[in-house]
A protein has these predicted regions:
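Class I S-adenosyl-L-methionine
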Residues: 1-256
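Secondary-structure boundary motif
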Residues: 248, 273-277
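A phosphate-binding catalytic loop at a beta-strand-loop-alpha-helix junction
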Residues: 253-274
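Class I S-adenosyl-L-methionine-dependent methyltransferase module
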Residues: 277-284
Length: 284
């Protein structure tokens, strides 16, 4: 490798010449239901999207995740302190990927409680009011009954989220929450933690408390090796979150992982730790 300073008149061209053949090889090595994650900074993310659209196909774009790589501002910055970094995800064949999920976290479960001592356990709730108006969704407009105050309720402008038959089922299943004394103007629909299947849909904003920071990664390596050796190491927590994503319900415990730029061996560390935690047989 040779340095590619931004003073070079071919700065972006040289970078593209470096990354293009590597991504071609990456695609050829991916399984049909495989995915690739690429960490990149703001300097080249726009170029990388174009290259990936060409190599993998625009339709195989999965997500552009925003990773919070640090949480403290730098007063040495002249304009803005960069706290985040893009993380691109592409699939080899998007039709082979029906869903991507991740395991539920303690943070996600913490929103569930049981203020009314429901025998079904902890729950959270969602609004019953539809953003659409009655004119837009006339089939979702009908009167509701508040059993606590014994009053009929209708929304002045908006429809409900559910058809009347579904509402009647919610009533039979005692899923509507009107408040402790019926004080809510409109009901909320109960969602029970016990009904969750232990997984959730991932979001495209990854906070540092869940995925680590570059500063912590550097400290971990320095503590391990006795001195600073790498400038842009990724935290193992970030890689572990990537590897923990479940594609089509598969936890990927026997997955084969390839890191094209394995400088500090963070990917190897993450693979070995995950295997130790869940008994997997991942290889790298």
């Amino acid at each position: 490798f040779k340095k590619n300073p931004d003073s070079n008149g071919r700065f972006h061209t040289d970078w593209l010449n470096m990354i293009y053949p590597r991504l071609r090889v990456a695609k050829s090595l991916l399984a049909d239901d495989g995915v690739i994650f690429i960490s990149i900074d703001d300097n080249e993310v726009h170029n990388l999207r174009k290259v990936c659209d060409e190599i993998f196909g625009e339709g195989n774009f999965v997500s552009q995740i925003v990773w919070e790589k640090r949480y403290t501002r730098s007063n040495n910055s002249k304009k803005f302190t960069t706290l985040t970094e893009p993380l691109l995800c592409y699939s080899k064949n998007i039709t082979s990927i029906l869903e991507i999920k991740e395991k539920r976290s303690k943070k996600a479960d913490s929103i569930y409680s049981n203020p009314d001592n429901d025998p079904r356990g902890a729950w959270t709730s969602v609004s019953y009011v539809n953003p659409a108006t009655k004119e837009q969704r006339p089939n979702l407009s009908y009167p509701l009954f508040n059993p606590i105050t014994e009053t009929t309720v209708d929304h002045p402008t908006n429809a409900w989220k559910y058809e009347k038959a579904t509402y009647e089922q919610h009533v039979r299943e005692d899923r509507l929450y009107w408040g402790r004394t019926g004080e809510n103007s409109y009901p909320r629909l109960k969602k029970f933690l016990s009904e969750m299947d232990g997984v959730m849909v991932p979001v495209d904003l990854w906070r540092q408390e869940d995925t680590g920071t570059t500063d912590q990664a550097s400290k971990d390596i320095e503590n391990l090796l006795g001195r600073k050796m790498f400038d842009f190491s990724k935290p193992k927590e970030l890689v572990m979150r990537i590897l923990s994503l479940m594609i089509n319900g598969d936890e990927g415990k026997d997955a084969l992982i390839l890191d094209f730029f394995s400088g500090s061996a963070t990917t190897a560390h993450a693979v070995m730790q995950l295997n130790a935690e869940d008994g997997g047989a991942r290889k790298f």
